């Protein structure tokens, strides 16, 4: 290839083993030319010898033209030949060996110069430092260093480096390796460091250093000299700056001015281009090229013979044909001749393997090279200038696999992936530039893929084309980057050719360059960039010249244009070419073929139609028939192309229209969804509040209010005046009544009856006359007026006037504030008024004025949907109102609390709506009225979507204080309401539980079925309510639909009809669902009733068994009473007590720990002696008030807990009424009931809350019974009649306590003794009453009353006992029990035999003794040691007295205890025998 503009930067950068065209060819000593053909005769140039010997350089011609350069050719040294003034030697070409070396061995007699060293060789040369050789630098144009600043060095250092660089390179643009080596060695750095510096500095790897690279090398040397380490690689900033400056220097070198090569005997093909660069040379006869190196080495036929031709101006006498030389003007007639007698034409010069030759200008005789003569035809030769496309022929070896590449890359109907380089790869010699054949193939590929004639190929298509080559993705990415320098994402025809050429080179083993060489830069891009640069330089030079010469201030008057001296071409325009440059363009109207009116430039005598025809008509007239036909065909082709282009454009427009329609449809669908969201939003009512009509209505309403304001203020002032007059009149009357005769009656004659000074004078005169008349008549003188009444009246007047003034000021303030507020409202309404443009736009999109039909349909559809959503919302609002009005009476019927709550909330609502002004001063009333007015106006504005201006009269701290006060007031009112509500609830609960005192039913009679549960009633009621609500919804929807039908248009009626049908279907479906729910609720109700009935039957059977057991118990009790009568009283009792006390330490059980701790049982714990048989009606002595658990009615229990899983009827206890302070309670009624029951046991921290799940409680009870069986727990006394009712918080069931009593009767004696001891030491009571109580408990243990349920008549309230905390707690707990003893389980049947005779006094005393408490619930902590009593529980509220009778008096016989103990021992087996029969009594299974 020809030497490019920057070929001097990298003379050996081509493929290894090849030399770039235009570079000095290096000769090697590895191949000596020994054999000479004998047919050659010595050339008559004055030298003898038939064979070539190594010769010294022998310059010929004029030596004054310049020094010659030493070449590296060993076999044939260079010789200066030719005409001396041309200063260009003939350069013979020598053969090269197959294995080419980069450096030749210098001859001993000549100093070695290494002109072709690579960057790596120069870097290695630093390792073995030796004295460098000097050489002569080639002649270059003056070096120009860009003014760009390098940031990694200072400006002073850069100036020094520039001076050093210029002094070292002279006029050259680059510094060769030897010079750089000399300079770097002066730093005295080791060779390894200098080698690293060279590798980092030579960024182009060309063996030369440009100025930025040289400055970088100096910078790195300075780093190393200062002791810092060299970086392994250059920083990105430094690298970018250096490469940018290198590019600027490289691109500044013009393509048509290559550097002068060293003067050698190699032919210089660039010389013809130096003569006239403005006109490109014509293609000339190319030189033949050898096919391959192997043929050359095997044949060795092309040998230089004799001495080289020397054009000395004369022709030597020889057998060789003369070679004409001479001046450039003679070159047209000269013909190059072969130098020798060869049987065949043989090429001379360089005959080794070489790449295809780039375009070479030839035909000028200034630098003739040896060429073949003889037999034509002539082979094609690459011609042209560097980088010019279309003049580069294919190499002699051809372009292998180019057709295969074309066939693969052509569009095919079915292609498959997975392409490889098989069949495309090779090792052909490919030049840098694109050859003619390649360009033709690449253009065909481009046109085949560019079916729409767009002029470019997109990235997706290029990926498909380039991917079929089989190259790696990384290589294709690099090729694309080089081909698309402007990053446009597409390739035109030239850029596509560059990409295909790089792919073809890569397939043949060539590396992909980092930067696109100048030969591959497309002409359009390069010429455009060069033209822009030339224009810029010309403009800058012209401006500089005019500024220096002062031409800016001297207008040009001569009319001479100097543009002819400006040209894009460096040389002057050739006169014979006739080509114009853009700088000397002149418009010629005659060349324009267009219509020209004949009326233009019409002279006076010229006829109207001009007889002369236009040049275009002349041209048409001169055309022949064939030319006209050709023109017609061309026009037809153009018309066809236009039609095809129009069709393609129409198709593209149709595609775009379809895409636009799809997008428009998607947008309209999104608009509909957004409109639906807006319509269904809760705040959609405020959406249209900002319309113009709404604002105008608000302004009219505001104006009406403003008109009413003066009248209201006048009325207020009149009222104030009348109030003031009334106050004065009232004061006069009161003062006259308090001070009779003190005031003078003064009749006012002033305006309005006002008293004037004259009236007062007259009154005083009248008073004096009356006094004188009384004195004359002897009557007592009337009381003289001392002026006190007048003073009091004046004071009152002043007070009334001041108050009136104050009220007037307040009225004015209110009036002004209302005016300001109304002004702000008016301003806000006026600011939002729409102008004509906005109104037009609003009407356009809201009323569909001036829009397309499709948009109009969309707007109407949105409006219909909006109206439908509005109607639906109104119906839902009406339905909610109907539901609320329907649910209120239902709520009143269902719960009596609702009336109270409604009565409580309605005053609050009315108070908030119209607050009472009682007890407020006038100022406070005015302020309240003002605040309410502002609040209403603010609410209206908020509903209208307006923002009124903030009230500046109230500061931020004042507003905070006011809000804080209001918040505190609301909280206080809420607390009061909660307290009232809680009190009413407690009262209602007490009314529900206490009045049930009906006589107990007979055991044989069947209980009435319990009422359905509240939950079931609620479900039924709610279902009925829902049904009615749905009916009302359907009716309201029907009415709304009817109204909508009357208003809607004809096309809207169909949509409304469909919607009505849908709503009817929905209503039917909802009615069916309600019916199904109602049936399910009825089924559940029937199931619950059946379960209740079965439970009652089981309960009756249980009652019969208990009655039978009760009979047996009474018989045993009669026998026990007879035995107690026969026992001794005092002595035996004392001995037995002593024995029990001694046995306390011997028995170890849980009763020691748990017995005494529960002296005061909890509300939820079954207690002792709460139900006594009827034969003992004596009142309770004041010893102790026994606690009684809550006894609940079975009807209420069943009604409240209708669990369908219960196998047997179980009465769950009703919560014990307890009233706690409202602030400490939860507002959940169920939670309050639990907290009320657990409040008395709050003093014991170990008590646990139990679950309300019946199955969970069953498991707890079973675990509790098991623990009671395995532990020595304290059991209640056997005489006690257990209640099967268990509170919700109770961990012990009634049945469980009975089982424990039955199963643990064998430990009753020991447990009773321990309990007696605990009671004795805990209550500090006398031992005798405690013994009597224990005796009574032990004696009653023999009775099986616990297995039967007897209901005694309601006993009288327990009398007051002593003030011990335990007794008080027991009394309070007993008081909490309800007074309803109508449980069927506690009824005493009439068949019970009469009780035995009354026992002894001791027995009477022991009858009501408090039994030991039952064991605490599981998890309770053990009692404190020593049997200390627990702290008393918190005081519960009073409740109706329980049914348990009071215990007997403390005084009892001492023998009763001994009899009780002995009887207890005998009762063990009896009770144990009967426990199986009553094991399930009262237990929840």
From Swiss-Prot:
It is found in: Cell membrane; Endosome membrane; Cytoplasm, Cytoskeleton, Actin patch. Its main location: membrane. Component of the PAN1 actin cytoskeleton-regulatory complex required for the internalization of endosomes during actin-coupled endocytosis. The complex links the site of endocytosis to the cell membrane-associated actin cytoskeleton. Mediates uptake of external molecules and vacuolar degradation of plasma membrane proteins. Plays a role in the proper organization of the cell membrane-associated actin cytoskeleton and promotes its destabilization. Residues 280-289, 997-1013, 1174-1184, 1390-1401, 1409-1448 have a biased composition (Pro residues). Residues 1144-1156, 1288-1306 have a biased composition (Acidic residues). Residues 1-10, 302-315, 328-349, 882-896, 1247-1273, 1340-1349 have a biased composition (Polar residues). Residues 788-819, 827-843, 871-880, 921-939, 956-991, 1016-1031, 1038-1139 have a biased composition (Basic and acidic residues). Residues 647-737, 1024-1150 form a coiled coil. GO terms for cellular component: actin cortical patch; endosome membrane; plasma membrane. This is Actin cytoskeleton-regulatory complex protein PAN1. Signal peptide: none annotated. Residues 1-119, 253-379, 596-622, 773-843, 868-1485 are annotated as: Disordered. SUPFAM superfamilies: EF-hand (SSF47473). GO terms for molecular function: actin binding; calcium ion binding. The lineage of its organism: Eukaryota, Fungi, Dikarya, Ascomycota, Pezizomycotina. It comes from Coccidioides immitis (strain RS) (Valley fever fungus). It is a peripheral membrane protein. Belongs to the PAN1 family. Component of the PAN1 actin cytoskeleton-regulatory complex. PROSITE patterns: EF_HAND_2, EH, WH2. The keyword Manganese does not apply. One of its GO terms (biological process) is endosomal transport. Residues 157-245, 438-527 form the EH domain. Keywords: Actin-binding, Cell membrane, Coiled coil, Cytoplasm, Cytoskeleton, Endocytosis, Endosome, Membrane, Repeat. It comes from the Eukaryota.
